[in-house]
Amino acid sequence: MGFDSVEEEWFSVWLRIAKKRGMVDGIIYHPSSFKLAPKQTIKEEVQLKTKTKIVDKFLLHPHKYTPDFVFYISNLISRYDHGLVPCKDNIVFVDVKGVYAGGRHNNSSITFPISQKWVYAKFGIYINKVVPEKFFRKTFVPKELTIGKSGKVLKKWKDYPVF
């Protein structure tokens, strides 16, 4: 499966391990999108040779938002201070971000908070922002991510809890 970022791939590995441990289930990558606003048009009168015609003139594109992951959590995850906010029925929606998701060249750093608020206001669903490096420190880093090409533990993960 191709992921949009290395952080999404890391989080999918975490989810796979967490599923084996009974902490999560029903994992879906890129579930159905939330339709937040339809395309906007305005009526405009166009003069033809012999008559006038009313047409829809394009004004704004539709806006939708697609989370990176959705899954169910069980009580077994409560041993960790994971910070995930579930919706009803313990469903968790997640958008995965890198450590440095800021900057004016990263569109997601601007659009995500707006979409997050909009989804919550319209559907009552909270989208959790997960930065794997921070999330792994609170929970665990999957062992397979800690080993580099040389077979040694990567310095990046040396102080993290490993499972």
Placement of each model-derived feature along the sequence:
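Electrostatic, structured charged patches in enzyme active sites and in nucleic-acid/phosphate-binding
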Residues: M1-F163
